[in-house]
Amino acid sequence: IAPATANVCAKLAHGLADDMLTTTLLACQCPRIIAPAMNTRMYENPITQDNLRLLEHYGFTIIEPASGLLACGDSGKGKFPDEGLILEYILRAIAYPKDLAGKKILVTAGPTQEAVDPVRYLTNHSTGKMGYALARMAMLRGADVTLVTGETSLTPPPFVNTVHIKSAHDLFEAVTSRSEEQDIIIKAAAVADYRPAVVSDEKVKKSDGDLSLALERTEDTLSYLGAHKRPGQLLCGFAMETEHMVEHAKE
């Protein structure tokens, strides 16, 4: 039901069926999703909140309203949620088999940033789209998903525990501290193999001569996970290649 008024929520919470909508909802046994939208003070009213909690108790899924300018001219929580978010709720409820229910899946995505100084860093062209798509599909199929992501322009999928990282070291710590409890780990991030050996505390000034940076290896997260993989755990790694892709993939 989108939008669901305070009146409709109250009727449904107490089993009233005096029109087609409430009568249908009282009789149906399919997944039921409600998107409350109303004035902020109506939404925050303890009676409305009690009704929403009661609906959740009876198996309704409640989509939290957004915050912003309301139809009445006020500004606050109670705004109709983004249609894309509502669609994700619907897809999650009815569109995909829940063959991954009960599974914990960790996905990495996006690039890493290796600082040169407070202003500059080394990175790559990864968009994160592959990892985000994998995390979203795992979520839609019922998995408990953790997404460890570098800086991207993408919005993390809903219902996913998102962990933001910057460097390869950050990613190593974020992944290895969570790896033991995961059933599946998918490494789709584009992780730097090297980082500056020394990070300047101040911006490196330009000069007439060339600039050389000493680089050192970063932690190999995938190798660590492979060496510490527990029985039954599935580990999947991605590698970006520009030539001999099949041969390198087999390696």
Predicted regions and their residues:
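Glycine-rich phosphate/diphosphate-binding loop of Rossmann-like nucleotide-binding domains
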Residues: 49, 53-54, 99-167
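Short, acidic/small-residue loops that bind anionic groups at enzyme active sites
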Residues: 12-39, 54, 63, 208-224
